A protein has these predicted regions:
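A short core secondary-structure module
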Residues: 199, 203-245
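A structural-propensity feature for long, helix-poor, extended segments
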Residues: 154-160, 439, 445-487
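Internal helix-loop-helix
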Residues: 59-60, 90-163, 167, 210-212, ...
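Alpha-helix capping/hinge segments and adjacent helical runs
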Residues: 2-5, 10, 17-19, 256, ...
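C-terminal amphipathic alpha-helical interaction region
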Residues: 454, 466-569
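C-terminal helix-coil-helix/basic helical segment that borders enzyme active sites and/or dimer interfaces
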Residues: 343-394, 490-504, 523-531
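Extended, charge-enriched "interface" segments that sit outside catalytic cores
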Residues: 1-81
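A glycine-rich, basic-preceded beta-loop-alpha segment at the flavin cofactor/substrate interface
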Residues: 35, 39, 241-244, 248, ...
Length: 569
């Protein structure tokens, strides 16, 4: 029986990272729930066993029920009936299976019906689901919107809404509008407080809303009359039970067919404020988007894993010229690079997730008591690390999953262009990952300051001092040379003092930094488990070294005056 977790031991390796000790310690707070909830862990080992068992259950559901339904869901898609959405029959079955297994509200405290899981094992579950059906993964993983409500909502909102998500109700985040895509400060959905109704009334249109007919919505709307920028925006909670939001249409998309992407019309929809006015975009949506970007990184890794599996299986079975095509260098070169990108991207994803876990757990503790000076320092450090790695994890993994599905189709040859193999679905589903929740270009905008302020370089230099196996020492030397090139290229861009030159070089610098960090992470993994990661570390070293050299050449040879050649009239 297929199991997306146990079939891929790389996940259990990431789960057992040494930082999990600190994460569990912070999350469970001396295991204080053990006397109140029979499913609360007694100690660290018990907590880790619980994560492992839930991942096993999720992997089994993903590898059987969700995988078996995926093709039918892709063909059927959701239905627009009146002003509402009806999921494809397979999607409804998938949701039912996940709810019955208790896989909702995973990161929420037990007092609300959650599992109190860290972000890391929850993110792994999101990867497992996406590997079978990325569209369904969107619906299920939008439960993590509840993190934002938990962080910024009040206790009354916590007690009313969080248990519903833990019980299996669905969520959406309603941000985008026809004239406000990447530029969210242009959002114009109007929020007006009604003294008569005793609530806020929302009016306007939202577009490209994933799972738009969800039970609970987090909505970005303009609450301040006469404003046109981000400071006039607030966040609201809309409950579908209140009425006032209709689905105008479901978009006809290239991929993720099971996920209903909706245009919504708000007509005096009753809503309540989440947090404080004017902080909707500049604080709450930024937190919401960071969580979503980690989720898309997990989705991308899941799709990459599925693409690699399909390519490997086809290459092993398909014979040409008297032997399986996997034996031809042109094919095993592609497969090896797919696996290296998969392993490197996954390492980056879970390094980021662990950093998020530590600072978020400390944030939560700070709501109960004052942090010690040591805890405040730890919180600040891991928050900065998480902020720096989030755009890399989302940007690089979404690009890698597009590349890996492309190569998997290439391995299939003409058969890959037919609709008979699942790889065509993975290819279509992958395309959106580098677009939604911030395009790759916007991830570069978020990441470039960590290049120019030296944060990524400092992380690389710290990695260079780590103990590694003898087999990996030559790779550390190569990674150091790559970091030297990053340092030189960064200095050149900063010295130029030209904004447009800085912007056109930004992606090159960010990818250089990502290549260096991911190589170090693979070196670390290969030191701990050579059997799982040594091949990928060597392959990725060859690939990333060439990539860094390419980007370095571009940046060092380009001049600010050359930008005139790039401007398209």
């Amino acid at each position: 029986m297929a199991n997306n977790y146990t079939d891929h031991p790389e996940l259990k390796f990431e789960l057992n990272h040494p930082l999990m000790k600190r994460i569990v310690e912070l999350k469970e707070r001396d295991f204080r729930d053990k006397d109140s909830y029979d499913y609360a862990p007694l100690d660290f080992e018990d907590a880790m066993d619980s994560y492992d068992r839930v991942l096993d259950i999720t992997g089994e559901i993903a590898g059987t029920t969700i995988a078996d339904n995926a093709e039918g869901v892709d063909l059927e898609g959701p239905h627009h009936e009146g002003d509402r959405v009806r999921y494809a029959s397979g999607t409804a079955d998938n949701l039912d299976a996940m709810v019955k297994a208790g896989l909702n509200g995973m990161t929420m405290p037990r007092r609300y019906g959650g599992l109190n899981f860290p972000i890391t094992p929850y993110t792994m579950c999101a990867e497992l689901v996406a590997a079978s059906d990325a569209g369904f993964g969107n619906i299920w993983s939008l439960q993590d919107c509840i993190e934002t409500l938990y962080e910024f909502g009040n206790e009354d909102q916590h007690s009313r809404f969080i248990p519903r998500i833990c019980a299996g109700e669905t969520m959406s985040m309603d941000l985008t509008e026809p004239d406000a895509g990447s530029d969210l400060q242009s959002v114009m959905l109007k929020a007006t407080y009604s003294e008569e109704e005793g609530c806020w009334l929302l009016n306007g249109v939202k577009r490209f809303i994933t799972n738009g007919d969800a039970n609970l919505h987090l909505v970005l709307a303009r609450s301040e009359e006469g404003t046109t920028d981000g400071r006039g925006l607030s966040m609201f909670i809309y409950d579908k039970n209140s009425g006032g939001v209709n689905v105008r249409r479901i978009e006809n998309k290239l991929g993720i067919h099971g996920s209903p992407t909706c245009e919504l019309v708000y007509k005096n929809a009753h809503a309540e404020l989440c947090g404080d006015r004017k902080l909707g975009l500049i604080k709450y949506v930024m937190a919401l988007m960071n969580g979503a970007r980690l989720g898309i990184a997990a989705q991308s890794v899941g799709i990459s894993q599925a693409a690699y599996n399909e390519g490997l299986a086809y290459a092993s079975d398909r014979e040409q010229f008297g032997k399986a095509i996997i034996n031809f260098p042109a094919v095993y070169d592609m497969l090896a690079l797919m696996k290296a990108k998969l392993d490197a991207g996954r390492a980056l994803l879970y390094q980021c997730a662990r950093y998020v876990d530590i600072y978020k757990a400390l944030d939560d503790i700070a709501r109960e008591r004052k942090l010690t000076p040591e805890e405040r320092k730890e919180q600040k450090n891991f928050s900065k690390l998480a902020d720096s790695l989030t755009p890399l994890a989302k940007g690089m993994n979404s690009e890698y999953c597009n590349q890996n599905t492309y190569d998997a189709i290439q391995i299939h040859g003409g058969s890959g262009f037919m609709m008979d193999y699942p790889i065509q679905r993975y290819y279509r589903d992958a395309r959106i990952t580098s677009i939604y929740e911030g395009t790759t270009q916007l991830q570069v905008v978020a990441a470039i300051r960590y290049v120019t302020n030296g944060s990524y370089l400092a992380q690389a230099r710290e990695f260079e001092q780590a103990e590694v196996s003898e087999a990996m020492k030559p790779l550390v030397a190569r990674a150091k040379a790559m970091a030297d090139k990053l340092e030189e290229a960064t200095a050149r861009v900063k010295e130029a003092g030209d904004a447009a030159f800085h912007d056109i070089c930004a992606r090159h610098l960010v990818e250089m930094a990502a290549d260096v960090i991911m190589l170090h992470l693979l070196i670390h993994n290969a030191t701990a488990n050579a059997e799982l990661f040594e091949k990928s570390a060597r392959v990725y070293a060859n690939f990333s070294e060439a990539e860094v050299a390419k980007h370095h050449t571009f940046v060092m040879n380009l001049r600010p005056e050359d930008l005139a050649d790039y401007v398209q009239a």
